[in-house]
């Protein structure tokens, strides 16, 4: 697991400031890919381990894209391709509500 960087700190601040955890009933959000590694990127890859229906998932993605001005790719852990999930878990950084 990697450590929080500026991109993740910005995401965490946005999630907390906009009550995203409460609004979408999330306990934590995992960040993986280039954002987790601190590399420049125009998207953020997010792993959701909570039960989220597809309508809520689309609303979450749309709201985060609007707030962060970045493309958001969301993977739901229970439906994820095992190879993608394995790679994500190697570098995941979790953001939680405090």
Regions found by a protein language model. Name each.
Residues 1-30, 36-41, 49-98:
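Catalytic core of pol beta-like nucleotidyltransferases
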């Amino acid at each position: 697991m990697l450590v929080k960087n500026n991109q993740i700190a910005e995401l965490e601040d946005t999630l907390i400031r906009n009550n995203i955890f409460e609004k979408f009933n999330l306990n934590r959000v995992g960040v993986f890919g280039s954002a987790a590694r601190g590399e420049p990127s125009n998207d953020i890859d997010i792993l959701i381990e909570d039960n989220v229906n597809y309508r809520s998932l689309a609303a979450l993605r749309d709201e985060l894209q609007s707030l962060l001005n970045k493309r958001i790719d969301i993977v739901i852990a229970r439906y994820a391709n095992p190879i993608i999930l394995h790679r994500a878990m190697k570098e995941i950084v979790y953001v939680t509500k405090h």
